[in-house]
Structure formats: C-alpha cells, structure tokens
C-alpha cells in the first residue's frame, strides 16, 4: 500500500478549463495528517505509518487514546489510520505532518470510503435483477428473485447467493480517478468524478495502483 492521505468529502462542484470545458469534481479536504506512530518490521512485524487527522474534544478521548497521542506529542484526532511502507518512501518522524503536497506529481488516485447505507433492499435494487412480468397473469411476483437453487441434488442454497439484504455502508474503493487540482493553500484535492460515501465522510486518497 502506497503512502496516502486521510481526508473528508466536502461535496461536488465543477471547474472550467481554459477552453471553457466543464469538469465535474469532488472536493476532498485533506488537512495535514499527523504521524502518531511509526511501525517497523522489528517491533511490529511490518513497516507502516500510523496517522491521525482532524481534531477531537479532549473530553471525548479515552485514556488509552489520550496516552497514545501524548506519547507521540500530537493533538488527538478523530481516528487513526495506517499506511503500509514499502521502503522507498523516505524518512519520517513521529509528530511530523503529511500534506496535500504529497500529490503534486500525481495524476491518478484511488479513493476509498464508506458507501452510503441503503438499508434492506430487494434483489432488483441490490443486484440489478430483472423484474418479472407486470401483467399476463403475474399478480404477486413482480420483483421477486425467482428460483434460488436447483433440485434434490445439491438440495441446498449455495453460500454467497445473491438475495435481498442490507445494501451499502461498506468499504468501497474507486480506482484511477483523475486528480484535477491540488490546492495546498486550502488543503484541498479536486478529483474528477464521484467518490464513495456521503458528504462529511472520511476518505483515504492514495496514488493509483493501476496508473
């Protein structure tokens, strides 16, 4: 996993090129990520940077977290995230900050977030199943899934069968999004297109693995 940044989805807007072409962009506010811990192969079994972002009221931070942040000498953030290190990322110190300038030379990014929760949904919405006949004698099974198995053999429903159930509210990554602009002054990343999650949700931005 490449080094990245934790940010917050602000919303969508559009920007214009010099030719007047409109580009739809998602605005991600990535305030400086503070390094809370540096994990190493010797002590933790793997190399990684643990970072925090944002702020949290002191009264809302439990003792374990407060001690962890105090040891690192960083202000308590709204959470902790890790980025695995491969060895070629350079030297880092606890308490240092990672900013949007990490992406100055990057053109494509992968954005990970938690998708919007949709609650309990049927097969048509959740899995794009085809609907059955609206008329011609069908009076009860318009959005029903149909058969879910075979016969006496195998005599069971296989695990993973697509059915109605809870939809959304899961970790989703959108790959190869174009990074249109880096605004270091306001700690903003402008990414072309949509990214997973609701406005205000935490997102992780990393250089694209397939770029």
Swiss-Prot record:
Molecular-function annotations in GO: rRNA binding; structural constituent of ribosome
Stretches that traverse the bilayer: none
GO CC annotations on file: cytosolic large ribosomal subunit
Keywords assigned by UniProt, alphabetized: Methylation, Ribonucleoprotein, Ribosomal protein, RNA-binding, rRNA-binding
GO annotation (BP), single: translation
InterPro entries hit by this protein: Ribosomal_uL3 (IPR000597), Ribosomal_uL3_bac/org-type (IPR019927), Ribosomal_uL3_CS (IPR019926), Transl_B-barrel_sf (IPR009000)
Pfam families xrefs: Ribosomal_L3
Residue numbers spanned by region Disordered: 135-155
Residue positions where N5-methylglutamine is found in the record: 152
PTM comment, free text: Methylated by PrmB.
Keyword Oxidoreductase attached: no
UniProt keyword rRNA-binding, yes or no: yes
Gene3D superfamilies from the UniProt entry: 3.30.160.810, Translation factors
Top-level taxon of the source organism: Bacteria
Annotated function: One of the primary rRNA binding proteins, it binds directly near the 3'-end of the 23S rRNA, where it nucleates assembly of the 50S subunit.
Family: Belongs to the universal ribosomal protein uL3 family.
Cross-referenced NCBIfam families: L3_bact (TIGR03625)
Known partners and oligomeric status: Part of the 50S ribosomal subunit. Forms a cluster with proteins L14 and L19.
PANTHER family, sorted: 50S RIBOSOMAL PROTEIN L3, LARGE RIBOSOMAL SUBUNIT PROTEIN UL3C
Protein name per the record: Large ribosomal subunit protein uL3
Protein source organism: Pseudoalteromonas translucida (strain TAC 125)
Lineage, broadest ranks: Bacteria, Pseudomonadati, Pseudomonadota, Gammaproteobacteria, Alteromonadales
Gene: rplC
